Amino acid sequence: MFARLNQLGRHLARSTPYYLHQSSAAGLSAPSRFTAAMAQERSKRTINTAGCIIIGDEVLGGKTVDTNSAWFAKYCFSLGINLKRIEVIADDEDEIIETCRRMSSAYDFVVTSGGIGPTHDDITYASIAKAFDLPLVLHEEALSKMKRLSKPRPGQENFSWDEDTPARKAKLRMVELPYDKNLKDEDQVIFAADDLWVPINIVNGNIHIFPGIPRLFEKMLTGLKPRLVPRLTDPEGKGVYRVLFSTPMPESEVAGYLTELAGRVKEKGINVGSYPRWGKSRNTVTLVGRDQEYMDSLIPEVEKNVKGRRVQVEGEDDDDGSDKDA
């Protein structure tokens, strides 16, 4: 009983976010667990690991196919960032709060995709603001860019920024951002391209909020790259090196050698992978790491032991042979 009362007391004492249109009396009533100093430290640390959060009922319901996480995985690989986790979650406040807090604490660089549109189910900004005890603030520069760059959609030819209408309120929701007044604006809001008004909103120093539209997601992440490169383990941005081998042998036949090889090269930071290709005549073996010179020296050995050859693209030497076992 006493434990439950204590838990209830802690819940009631929890601070809540405040919003631009509310009075200051509705602000934080207790010291936040998430401080500006913590966010500042996260925003400057070396980027070794990453996490990706795909937000959207439409993805979980099968209406939309998520391509952003696959693109982000390739993006991280090209920069030498170790992508540790991808999660797909619903447009649900509690899930967004829990996932963002957890990933922000666990990884150096986190992106979210989806849920920042004008409709009622676009709750990413509000949920992340709540997760980190921040207000939602109308960002004036983002609003100015929106007015200048956005084009009226079909059916909105008579839209006016000067009239207080439901359509105007819906548009404003897309530039009401989680915002910490104790941090520099440039550390919280980035415009990735001159022809885009959609901002990259950075929260708690490492949560980067992106739209779910693939072409915008990709363009904005590409525009962010120059800011990330100086913080990488390899500031030259060379990324990770991958060597592909095509083998006609079933996985069961090469498993012993690959196990021995993996143990031998682990201390060099090299991972050995084996991937069956169902319905194809050849399977794939990979070496992934940063020591290109050492990995290249292993090529003749691997080719010999898997009775295959190095390829540049998986499947480039496929034929019509039979299935291989997994």
Outline where the language-model segments fall:
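Glycine-rich phosphate/diphosphate-binding loop of Rossmann-like nucleotide-binding domains
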Residues: 41-86, 91, 293-300
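Solvent-exposed alpha-helices and their adjacent loops that cap or buttress functional pockets
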Residues: 43-45, 103, 169-170, 174-177, ...
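Eukaryotic N-terminal low-complexity, Ser/Thr- and Lys/Arg-rich leader segments
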Residues: 1-49, 306-326
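Glycine-rich beta-strand-to-loop/alpha-helix junction loops that act as flexible
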Residues: 55-57, 112-120, 211, 288-290
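N-terminal small/polar loop signature for handling phosphorylated ligands or for N-terminal nucleophile
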Residues: 6-7, 67-131, 148-151, 325
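An accessory alpha-helical subdomain
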Residues: 205-303
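Proline/glycine-rich low-complexity loops and linkers
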Residues: 123-232
